[in-house]
A protein has these predicted regions:
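Polyanion-engaging groove/track-forming segments
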Residues: 1-742, 757-767, 774, 778-789, ...
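Short beta-strand or tight-loop elements
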Residues: 268, 300, 493-498, 560, ...
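Short, contiguous acidic/charged loop-to-helix segments that flank catalytic cores in large enzymes
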Residues: 446, 465-468, 487-490, 547-553, ...
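Metal-dependent nuclease catalytic regions and adjoining charged, substrate-binding loops involved
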Residues: 578, 601-605, 743, 878-973
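Non-catalytic protein-protein interaction segments used by genome-maintenance enzymes to assemble
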Residues: 807-882
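Metal-dependent nuclease catalytic cores in nucleic-acid-processing enzymes
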Residues: 505, 552-572, 862-896, 945
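Short, charged/polar surface micro-motifs in flexible loops or helix N-caps
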Residues: 40, 519-523, 813, 854-858, ...
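Adenylate-forming
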Residues: 164, 707, 793, 820-824, ...
């Protein structure tokens, strides 16, 4: 008997008519086929509203019908689950000679794409012999492995059911079939419908109007169903206007239509939202949702429809969670996206797959590890501070710092049975999180329990697979866990706004709907093709009835968008991102323009609402939450302080407003009594500290007093300088003994270079930081290039002074007794520091100080004074007053670049100090005058520090572009 087709536009009453006929046939045990499992309960409620009790019939998905037919035949095989099927494909790929595909097969996405392609081929009822090349070989190997294990996958079950229905009279007993919500039928589904229509009454509902561009993607399905119906076609007229607002009914008829329709008044039934960024768009939607909920609109009657739930999941959770909007996402969630699953997968990745330090601490930081959060922070901070990265070193050092082992790591690494290890770990994780005194209650706890149950089911599936197929590796278990999804969440929970994608929205009904993603690139979506089956191959296989060709992405999204616009009965909101988060403009989707074109321009403008990137707060009246009202109050305080104060007093927000407005004031002078007491008691100052204060007192306050530190160790200029100084110290202290000289010359240059190589190796071994091989090589080669050049330049130097003293500390307890008092600055203040090197006249008590610089630049005599560089002038006073040598000058020695030494030299000693820049030699009066001014500058700077005199005073009057401290000192930046 032929199939019956019910066709018509959206909301023409097709499904209602189908449900009525289903109820009329209850005495014949009818079967109603719906698209998704989540639709079963939704349709059940619709039927219960029509008839209080249903005493017959069933509501199934296509999979349910296929299973019923296949398993009733008696020859059915066990069906592999998704996880087992993925493991089977991994096994096939491991054994197959991939030839040209070997490079691609290394990546996990290769197996996933092959799985999808094999599913399409089986759904198209194709055999390996109908294909060619590597795909045919892989398909044949896959089928052979299934046969060897005496298993079916889901698609083979479908194929078997379709074949049984075509050949076995007992496969179906005359129950009428009703189906809706299927626009793209696979080969197996089409074979089932064909076979059923030959044996019983089959009624199919299809949204379709011939000739309308909105239904172009359904043309093939409609034509095939019409041919199968053989004239039994009911075309229903448009009826959306009977239940929906006039503007919505007008949109249904005019959207993507070739003929021109007279515009009707919008009257608020269609509204347009534009905002900057995904977060801004969702906050605009959230504000409107709150307003609707507060007016009494039931949350379950509102739907948020988006092209992809996955892409918007994170900003959606942030925006809706901040505003306190109850919502439910209709769709699958990967196990690794749940807190419980993320902790577990991270732990397995670290223990079994050589994961990173971050993977281990993702687990340890979770409530499921059983380790105190404070202890985790301490251990991770120390490991990051030493850049410990390799898994073994992370465990070794982490357990040493923690004082006890991490049991999960050892148990997983030593486990003989990966499944039992995961089962024990998950049970312990749940106990750690909840124990006996904190039973799992609340939404978060329910999610943890759902995840735990899903894991147990998966482990049971994997155990069955191991019994069938043999060994199961740790990699297999970890891969299965990462791919596992939780059972789909319902998006129609009472009291919650439903969040659905375009595909799931087809069978839903709302009073109010928000359609998101109406910017170019989001809708229509870019098409994707399989690397295994291109369009030409699909076209050729379709000639054999495989039904592998899919409509192009534009026509498909056009239909889905048309359907989404017909979901609401009262109001439709269209939402687009007018700009990115960084302000770059985004073009609207063509679908956005199509909707606006069916209404009057002025009407569209009236019902368009925009939120610009600069709109950091809502208006005070429209702020949806107290937090946003407080932010709006702070903005009001900038323009109307009196009004803001009055509002704050009326609502008890005075302290909050004061705290917010004080953030705009930038006082710098230190006033706290304890801080001033600490600074006032300070009598000794390091020379580099004074130089930093001279550069900018605010920068000094942040760097030297607050002293924030980066938690992650890096191979930076500071580390390079430390290693270079250490290597130079070792070199010059060992030179007299190992080279037999006090001064280098060209005759021993090669021996000196070899000694420097040994000293650098020792200095590198002393680095208390775990570096990667690349980092270690880069540091070694960069320093070796510079230090070798320094040694060779020393060998070529005409300087007759001999390097005698190195790393001379003064002004501290670790200094020599005669140097501990430091350099007297006057007013009871003294200077501390460390001189890198002193070169001495072998025939007299004279010398020069040398200060190594790891960079390329050295300060000239003029720059020393103009830029307030104090080291060389003050070090020369230390040389004279504490060391007891007459200073001939001081030099900065850059270790990189041209390595040209610059500094402050006495012109009277030009014969002794040859070869330096002419401008660095000063006459006696100028030389000692500059030195004395440096001492006075140091005294003044030290005095300012003691009184807490911190201001915004960057050298030159403007903050340098490279300074990154402005976020703390709060200096406005362009």
């Amino acid at each position: 008997m032929p199939l019956s087709l019910i066709a018509g536009p959206a909301n023409a009453g097709k499904v209602e008519l189908l449900l009525d006929r289903y109820l009329d046939a209850l005495d014949r045990e009818p079967v109603l086929i719906v698209p998704n499992r989540s639709d079963v309960e939704y349709v059940s409620r619709q039927l219960i509203r029509r008839r209080p009790a249903l005493l017959g019939g069933s509501i199934d998905t296509f999979d349910d019908v296929f299973e019923r037919i296949a398993f009733a035949g008696g020859a059915a095989r066990p069906v592999v689950s998704k996880a087992q099927r993925a493991l089977l494909v991994r096994r096939v790929l491991a054994a197959a000679p991939l030839d040209g595909l070997a490079a691609s097969a290394r990546f996990g996405g290769f197996a996933d794409e092959l799985l999808r392609t094999l599913g399409e081929l089986e759904s198209g009822l194709l055999d390996p012999g109908e294909l060619a090349g590597d795909l045919a070989a892989l398909y044949a190997a896959y089928r052979a492995e299934l046969d060897r294990l005496d298993l079916w996958d889901r698609d083979l079950l479908r194929r078997s059911a379709a074949e049984r229905l075509q050949s076995d009279l007992d496969a179906w007993h005359g129950e009428p079939v009703f189906a809706y919500g299927f626009e793209d039928l696979t080969g197996a589904e089409w074979a089932l419908l064909e076979a059923l229509s030959a044996r019983t009454d089959v009624s199919v509902s299809l949204p379709y109007e011939p000739g309308r561009p909105a239904f172009t993607s359904l043309r093939r399905t409609a034509e095939d169903l019409q041919r199968l119906a053989a004239g039994r076609i009911e075309e229903l007229p448009p009826r959306y206007s009977e239940v929906a607002q006039p503007a919505l009914a007008h949109l249904e008829r005019a959207l993507f239509a070739d003929e021109v329709h007279e515009p009707v008044a919008v009257d608020g039934a269609v509204r347009f939202f534009e905002a900057a960024g995904a977060r801004g768009a969702l906050e605009l939607v959230g504000e409107e949702l709150l307003a609707l909920l507060r007016t009494g609109v039931p949350a379950e009657s509102i739907g948020v429809i988006c092209p992809s739930v996955e892409r918007l999941r994170a900003p959606l959770e942030t925006a809706f969670g901040t505003l306190g909007i109850p919502y439910a996402v209709d769709g699958e969630v990967r196990l690794a996206q749940t807190p419980f699953g993320q902790a577990l997968v991270s732990m397995l990745r670290f223990a079994w797959l050589g994961g990173s330090r971050g993977d281990l601490f993702t687990f340890l930081r979770s409530p499921f590890s059983g380790v105190e959060r404070r202890a985790v922070d301490f251990v991770e901070g120390r490991l990051r501070g030493r850049a410990v990265q390799s898994p073994d070193r992370v465990v070794e050092e982490g357990e040493r710092l923690h004082g006890r082992p991490f049991p999960a790591v050892a148990e997983l690494r030593e486990a003989d049975d990966p499944l039992e290890a995961v089962r024990l770990l998950t049970a312990r994780m749940l106990r750690n999180a909840y124990g006996l005194e904190a039973p799992p209650v609340g939404e978060a706890s329910r999610l943890d329990l759902r995840t735990y149950e899903t894991l147990n089911r998966l482990l049971t599936e994997l155990e069955r697979w191991r019994k069938l197929a043999g060994e199961l590796s740790r990699d297999d278990v970890a891969s299965a866990l990462e791919r596992q999804t939780l059972r789909p969440l319902r998006g129609d929970e009472p009291g919650r706004v439903a969040v659905v994608d375009l595909l799931r929205a087809r069978t839903r009904r709302f009073d109010i709907a928000f359609v998101l993603g109406l910017e170019e690139g989001s809708l229509p979506r870019r098409g994707s093709s399989s690397p295994f089956l291109d369009d030409d191959a699909r076209r050729q296989l379709d000639e054999r009835g495989a039904r592998l060709q899919r409509p192009d992405s534009v026509s498909r999204d056009r239909y889905l968008f048309y359907t989404a616009c017909k979901r609401p009965l009262e109001r439709l909101y269209l939402v687009r991102e007018a700009a990115t988060d960084d302000g770059s403009p985004r073009e609207p989707s063509p679908f956005w323009d199509e909707v606006q074109a069916v209404f009057d321009v002025e009407d569209v403008r009236r019902w368009t609402r925009r939120r610009s990137l600069s709109a950091l707060t809502w208006s005070l009246d429209g702020a949806p939450t107290e937090r946003e009202r407080l932010r709006a109050l702070a903005e009001l305080a900038a323009n109307d302080p009196g009004g803001a104060d009055a509002l704050a007093r009326a609502n008890g927000w005075e302290r909050r407003l004061e705290r917010a407005t004080s953030a705009f004031r930038r006082p710098t002078k230190l006033t706290h009594a304890l801080v001033l007491e600490q600074l006032g008691a300070k009598a000794t100052f390091n020379v580099t500290e004074l130089e930093r204060f001279a550069d900018c007192s605010s920068a000094w306050f942040v760097e030297r007093f607050l002293s924030p530190r980066s938690i992650d160790a890096e191979v930076d200029a500071k580390l390079r300088g430390s290693v270079a100084h250490n290597a130079l110290y070792k070199f010059f202290t060992r030179m007299p003994k190992e080279l037999g000289v006090e001064q280098l010359d060209e005759r021993i240059a090669e021996d000196a270079v070899r000694l420097m190589r040994a000293c650098l190796d020792e200095a590198l071994q002393g680095v208390r930081m775990d570096m990667t091989e690349m980092q270690a090589r880069e540091l070694d080669q960069g320093l070796w290039r510079d230090l070798e050049a320094v040694v060779r330049s020393e060998c070529e130097s005409e300087l007759t002074l001999v390097p005698r003293r190195f790393e001379i500390l003064f002004g501290g307890e670790r200094a020599a007794p005669e140097l501990q008092r430091g350099l007297d600055l006057g007013d009871g203040l003294s200077l501390s520091g460390k001189i890198d090197r002193i070169d001495v006249d072998p025939f007299g008590a004279r010398g020069i100080v040398q200060d190594y610089k790891s960079g390329k630049h050295a300060h000239s005599a003029r720059e020393i004074e103009s830029e307030l560089r104090l080291q060389i002038p003050l070090y020369m006073l230390v040389l004279r007053d504490l060391v007891g040598l007459e200073p001939l000058g001081g030099l900065y020695r850059p270790l990189a670049g041209e390595r040209k030494a610059r500094g402050l030299l006495r012109a009277s000693e030009g014969e002794t100090l040859k070869g330096y820049s002419r401008n660095d030699y000063l006459e006696e009066e100028a030389f000692w005058g500059q030195v004395d001014r440096a001492r006075e500058t140091a005294r003044v700077l030290a005095g300012r520090i003691r009184t807490g005199d911190v201001v915004h005073d960057p050298k030159g009057g403007e903050c340098p572009a490279w300074c990154d401290l402005w976020t703390i000192c709060r200096v406005p930046r362009a």
